[in-house]
């Protein structure tokens, strides 16, 4: 998350968890 200063974002959707 950019607001948290973390370069890694985790997106959770119908397909499951995705790390980009």
Swiss-Prot record:
Top-level taxon in the UniProt lineage: Eukaryota
Gene Ontology terms for molecular function: carbohydrate binding; IgA binding
Keywords, in A-Z order: IgA-binding protein, Lectin
Family per record: Belongs to the jacalin lectin family.
Function text: D-galactose-specific lectin, binds the T-antigen structure Gal-beta1,3-GalNAc (Thomsen-Friedenreich-antigen-specific lectin). Potent and selective stimulant of distinct T- and B-cell functions. Shows a unique ability to specifically recognize IgA-1 from human serum.
Subunit structure: Tetramer of four alpha chains associated with two or four beta chains.
Name recorded for this polypeptide: Agglutinin beta-3 chain
């Amino acid at each position: 998350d950019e607001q948290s200063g973390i370069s890694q974002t985790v997106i959770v959707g119908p397909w499951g968890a995705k790390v980009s």
